[in-house]
Amino acid sequence: MTTRAELELPDLGATRALGRRLAGLLRGGDVVALKGPLGIGKTELARALIRARAGAAIEVPSPSFTLVQDYPLESLLIRHIDLYRVEDPAELVELGLEVPGPDEVWLIEWPERAEPLLPDDRLELGLAPGPEPDARIVRLVAGPGWIDRLPTPGDERT
């Protein structure tokens, strides 16, 4: 993991906008790790990303109880994975979650529970409370495969 950046998002709308922006950057084989405490907005960010990539306001339930929700889209299978209830990384192997396929993108909530199995070349978004009740601070840590894709300040590529 190499590049680090920090963003301040003033409200839920900005969190969703970040998800929509990231949707256009995804490639097959990507892993996006969403970290942060309960209720911080990980699922909202993932939901906005999935809907933007789908190009429609599809239903995107939280995968808290199913562990995995699959979204087969035109060019990618997005797997929204919630590891909150996973106690041992070996459980992921039992679920068939070892390595994303070349046409898959994994969005993982609570990735800390599978740290040894995660690829080094991933995008991590750590969400934390901001200075106002609805604000969030997002810490991005990007692996080498993400460096050329992430916008720099003032860059409007996405």
Language model features by range: what are they?
Residues 59-60, 64, 68-110:
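Conserved nucleotide-sensing/catalytic segment adjacent to the nucleotide-binding pocket
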Residues 42:
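Conserved lysine of the Walker
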Residues 2-21:
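N-terminal pre-Walker A segment at the start of P-loop NTPase domains
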Residues 37:
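P-loop (Walker A) phosphate-binding loop of NTP-binding proteins
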Residues 24-29:
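Phosphate-binding P-loop
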Residues 5, 88-158:
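Short phosphate-coordinating micro-motif centered on Lys-Gly-acidic
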